[in-house]
Swiss-Prot record:
Protein name: Paramyosin
Family: Belongs to the paramyosin family.
Coiled-coil stretches: 23-839
Nonhelical region: annotated segments: 1-22, 840-866
InterPro entries: Myosin_tail, XRCC4-like_C
Keyword Coiled coil assigned: yes
Length: 866
């Protein structure tokens, strides 16, 4: 009997040790979980500190850039102010985040400390209960006198165990659903990871596109600078050419005036020569008639002298000889005069020919004068067209200024969008960290539930072992049952008190858990409202930006159409200019009655040239402004590249957070597999319990009558225990439902965050398309600038050709001037010869010959001038 009692005592102590071990394991697991949570909080704080250090470094870099670009323009000052405001906001956010992290860390430490204290109190209570249970079991070894009552209690315990098993089955089903949800979340997170990787690749491609765009902008900048230099040189050349043309026009006008005066003088001399020729012919006819009359009179006198003065033959012979000498001289004069008449006739014929040539030349000069007048009219039209083109260029310059301003505004908008995207990425990071914290909290609660389930399983195992021990010790306990009835009543009261104390402790722990849950709910709700407001504001800003970008795109399309129309107009203008140049080469002389108009037009051209010079200076100033703006744009592009690098770093941090979340989910899957194994173990234990139940029923039928009195008390105690157990189970079930609801809310939040990330991705793609449109616009503007440069080169070539033509005309003018000088020299020589010959007898004929030679020389001079 004593050996049997010692064996039963050893078995009871073993069962009690097994019943206490799950609580210690639960405490150890709780401590480990708390340590893991502390490690996670520390890692999060380290990451936050690193992020704060990165932000401070970025803030320092931005401040240096702001100091470097401080005195550029008012726009940069406004940008600096905005950036400083954003930096202050970021600093405040960092300080708030650090403060919130420190508060959360202190609150978590306090909670962990309180939880450890409560767990230590529970361990002490369990140790006390263990001692009391050992005492009770040592007494129960001697006091089991009515096994039927114990068997009834075992049956009721079985029923309660079955109800507990049903509750555990429901919990298992819920846990299975939770595991399925966790698996779904794992798949969703994997998909999100794949999306994030794809987004990372897309961001890398976008980065490359931005770098290519930056290179294109730099090339466009260099090409624009070269084009501006070419335009400046072409404008200078045009101004010089126009001054040269004005000087040539004035010289040509003076030459034309001189030629007109000479032409008038020559026409007067020709009329004088004609009058002299007519007079000379009349003199010749008079001389012929006179000489004939004199001969007739001489012959009559000679016959009368023969008839009347035969006596005076000697005198008459002398007179005859004299007359004969006179006749010889007259015949000589006659021959000379005939020769001179022939020469004069030939000279008259040559003069008539020269006169016809002069008439033809006068007609050609009149036609040239009409053509020059037409050219002057065309030049006036060209001047008007140039003024209109100048106005158009001024309007185009203003539009280009507006385009540059729009581009600067777009760059500012892109910078703001990049900042907003950075803020949104930071908010998403914080939301992911919060989600990770919530997952860790859920895992901790799950571990608590697992520990409670382990406790229940250990209690069931202890109950089974106690039933087995009671079955073995039934024979030894019958003698001591009567003696132990009164003691059992006292012990039952003590057990009731212990159950009440346990109930109070459990209610206290449940209240603390409810308080923590309410705090977490309030925190999550506040965070949700804050995130919702931020996302709504970001969505509104993005919609406004989309409207602005759409308007800008419409304006750019309109400007493209206007520029295409302008290109067509410029091409038509170039064709007109070429035609006018061809007409101008054929029309270089101007008539006299249009000379005043030409002078007025020349003055107008001078004023137009002055206006063009002023416009050129204005264009140079505007080009300098555009160069400064291009430099500002390059600075902004550099800032955008730095922001891109910062975004890449943030994406790397997000990927690390995603890897941590995936590892946590893998740990959750491992826990789910462990739960399944524990479910299988519980099923095996239920089978063993059913077998024991069959044995107990066989014994119960034999010992029903002996244990009715004790069964009443045991039923009351068991009813109390079942009521308390049901309450605990209901509370735990309610807690599990709340945790499930929180988990569903967290999953919905994750889905909303993913949807918002997709929205941001779409917005980023839209911004990328806008950037491509801007790049196309820049390329089109570059093409237009190239075309204008080609046109300016064509204008330059035309001006060079005009200069060559003007040089040719100047050479012709110089040759004509030399010929005129030679003709004047010849005229002077002829006048000298005439004065010399006038002294002699044939002065009149010599003067006529001189006049004819002068007219011939002047005709030759006119032909050389033509």
């Amino acid at each position: 009997m004593m050996n049997h009692d010692t064996e039963s005592h050893v078995k009871i102590s073993r069962t009690i040790y097994r019943g206490v071990s799950p609580s210690t394991t639960r405490l150890e697991s709780r401590v480990r979980e708390l340590e893991d949570i502390l490690d996670l909080e520390r890692d999060a704080r380290v990451r936050a500190e690193r992020h704060a250090a990165d932000l401070s470094y970025q803030v320092d870099a931005l401040s240096e850039r702001l100091d470097e670009a401080g005195g550029s323009t008012t726009q940069t000052q406004e940008l600096l102010k905005r950036r400083e405001m954003e930096i202050n906001k970021l600093r405040k956010d960092l300080e708030n985040a650090n403060a919130s992290l420190e508060l959360a860390e202190t609150s978590m430490r306090r909670r962990h400390q309180t939880a450890l204290n409560e767990l230590s109190l529970e361990v002490e209570n369990l140790q006390k209960q263990k001692g009391k249970a050992e005492k009770d079991k040592s007494h129960l070894i001697m006091e089991v006198d009515n096994v039927l009552g114990q068997l009834d209690g075992a049956l009721k315990a079985k029923q309660s165990a079955e109800s507990k098993l049903e509750g555990l089955d429901s919990q298992l089903n819920r846990l299975k659903t939770l595991t399925d949800d966790l698996q779904r979340q794992l798949t969703e997170l994997n998909n999100a990871k794949s999306r994030l990787t794809s987004e990372n690749f897309e961001l890398l491609h976008i980065n490359q596109d931005y770098e290519a765009q930056i290179l294109n902008y730099s090339k466009a900048k260099s090409s624009l600078e070269s084009q501006v230099d070419d335009l400046k040189r072409s404008l200078d050349d045009e101004s010089r050419n126009r001054f040269n043309l004005q000087a040539q026009l004035t010289s040509l006008q003076m030459d034309y005036d001189n030629l007109q005066a000479k032409y008038d003088e020559e026409s007067e001399e020709a009329s004088n020569l004609r009058n002299q020729v007519s007079k000379f012919n009349a003199d010749i006819a008079a001389l012929k008639s006179k000489f004939e009359r004199e001969l007739m009179s001489k012959t009559e006198e000679f016959e009368e002298m023969k008839r009347k003065l035969t006596m005076r033959i000697t005198e008459l012979e002398d007179v005859a000889e004299r007359e004969r000498l006179k006749a010889v001289s007259l015949e000589k004069l006659k021959t000379k005069l005939t020769l001179e008449i022939k020469d004069l006739q030939s000279e008259i014929e040559s003069l008539s020919l020269e006169n016809g040539e002069l008439i033809r030349r006068a007609k050609s000069a009149e036609s040239l004068a009409s053509e020059l007048q037409r050219r002057v009219d065309e030049l006036t039209i060209e001047v008007n067209t140039l003024t209109s083109q100048n106005n158009q260029l001024e309007s185009e310059n203003m539009r280009l200024k507006s385009l540059v301003n729009d581009l600067t505004d777009k760059n500012n908008a892109l910078e703001r969008e990049n900042r907003q995207m950075n803020d949104q990425v930071k908010e998403l990071k914080s939301s992911l960290r919060d989600a990770n914290r919530r997952l860790t909290d859920l895992e901790a609660l799950r571990s608590q539930l697992e520990a409670e389930r382990d406790n229940l399983a250990s209690a069931l195992h202890d109950a089974e072992e106690a039933l087995r021990d009671m079955d073995q010790k039934y024979q030894a306990s019958q003698a001591a049952l009567n003696h132990l009835k009164s003691e059992m009543e006292q012990r039952l009261r003590e057990r009731d008190e212990e159950l009440e104390s346990l109930r109070k402790s459990t209610t206290r722990t449940i209240e603390e858990l409810t308080v923590t849950i309410t705090e977490m709910e309030v925190k999550y709700k506040s965070e949700l409202s804050r995130l919702k407001k931020r996302y709504e504001s970001s969505i509104a800003d993005l919609e406004i930006q989309l409207d602005a970008t759409n308007k800008a795109n419409a304006n750019l399309m309109k400007e493209n159409k206007n520029l295409a129309q302008r290109v067509k107009d410029l091409e038509t203008f170039l064709d007109d200019e070429r035609r006018l140049r061809e007409a101008a080469e054929n029309n270089l002389q101007i008539t006299e009655h249009k000379r005043i108009q030409l002078a007025n037009e020349v003055e107008e051209l001078r004023s137009a040239m002055e206006n063009l010079e002023r416009l050129r200076k204005h264009a140079e100033t505007e080009l300098e402004e555009t160069q400064s703006r291009v430099s500002e744009l390059t600075i902004q592009v550099n800032t955008l590249s730095n922001d891109k690098r910062r975004l890449e770093g943030d994406i790397g941090v997000m990927q690390a957070d995603m890897d941590d979340a995936i590892n946590a989910k893998q740990a959750a899957e491992d826990r789910a597999t462990r739960l399944n194994n524990e479910v299988l173990r519980l099923a095996d234990e239920l089978r063993q319990e059913q077998e024991n139940y069959k044995h107990a029923e066989a014994l119960r039928k034999q010992l029903e009558i002996e244990i009715r009195e004790i069964t009443v008390k045991l039923e009351e105690a068991e009813a109390f225990a079942t009521r308390e157990g049901r309450r605990m189970v209901q509370k735990l079930q309610a807690r599990v439902r709340e945790l499930e609801a929180e988990f569903d809310g967290e999953s919905r939040r994750c889905k909303d965050a993913l949807a918002q990330a997709r929205k941001f991705e779409r917005q980023y793609k839209e911004l990328q398309t806008q950037a491509e449109d801007d790049r196309r616009m820049v390329l089109e503007l570059q093409d237009l600038l190239d075309k204008t440069q080609m046109k300016m080169k064509a204008y330059k070539r035309q001006l060079e050709e005009m200069e060559e033509v003007s040089q040719i005309t100047m050479n012709k003018y110089r040759k004509a001037q030399q010929q005129i000088e030679e003709a004047e020299h010849r005229a002077d020589m002829a006048e000298r010869t005439v004065t010399v010959r006038r002294v002699g007898p044939g002065g009149r004929a010599v003067s006529v010959a001189r006049e004819l030679s002068v007219t011939s020389n002047r005709g030759m001079r006119a032909t050389s001038m033509m």
